Amino acid sequence: RYEHFLEDHNIINVLANNLPAPFDRFLARSLMKGSQVFTHRYQDALIDAWVVFYNPVPMAEKLPRRLDEYHIRRLGEEFAHFHQTCDEISATLPPSSKTLDTDLDHLMEIVNSEFGRYEHRQFEDEIRRQITLFRQAEAELQAEAFNKVPVFVDWNIGNFSVTGDVRLFSRWDYDWFRMASRILDFYFLSRVVSDAGDRTVFSYNIGPLSEDRFLLFLKHYHAVYPLTEQEIRFLPEVYRFFILKYVIMDGRYFFHEIYASKLQKEAYSTYFPSIESGFDAEKVLVSLGF
């Protein structure tokens, strides 16, 4: 929705200007048109498209496709510092009307529409069931009360750069930005540090959340900016939300149609069924000292 797009990029621009050192140059500044973020919207009978314009952001070093333990430890510490800094300035940011629940409400509207019944034929009931499971867990863990901070969700070694001593230097690509719990960043961070490393051909399996390499990342993150038990238990629900929102609902906007269809088929055959058994919260909690 264009209104959410405009809202998000206004927040990003304020965030870019308000982040203190060492993150004061981490994000690009938007071009401005008067007092507004410079966007352009094109609409006709078939298309409703929009873009936003940013100043260039400098790049430092890219991480290797497969990280070693030094990189993982440093990234755990760096992302903890970044999230903590974002939390400290979150009160200075414009309000956001988009939440996890409003996105799922929108998905339900689509599923209940004539278009949605055709687009998601045979899987409408499964989508409703997954939304119900998410909302039950959200209520049990009181996840709506988690602090809301700026999160970019999609992290991969192609959209941020680091210094030689693995300090976060710059980030570009803000397509999935939102104000939400810091936990929304963790599925993609688990992929960044995974044993498989960064890949050009991929699936969205839950496996990276259970790897020892991600546990190493969490330990170093937790030592700087401690996680709560409820946040750890919410990790598989963040994964569930990601599949519902970015694969099922918006997949055809972010991926080529053929690849979007592949990911959606995998969602029903593999991703959703793996949620209950693919992540051991107790193992993580014990490792973090709970």
Language model feature labels by segment:
Residues 60-64, 170-171, 198-200:
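Short small-residue beta-strand/loop micro-motif enriched in glycine and branched aliphatics
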Residues 64-123, 148:
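A cross-family kinase active-site recognition segment
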Residues 70, 229-239:
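All-alpha amphipathic helical-bundle segments outside canonical DNA-binding/catalytic cores
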Residues 136-184:
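Active-site acidic catalytic loop and adjacent metal/ATP-binding pocket
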Residues 184-225, 240-258:
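Active-site activation/catalytic loop segments of kinase-like enzymes and analogous catalytic loops
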Residues 245-290:
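ATP/Mg2+ or Mg2+-diphosphate-binding catalytic cores
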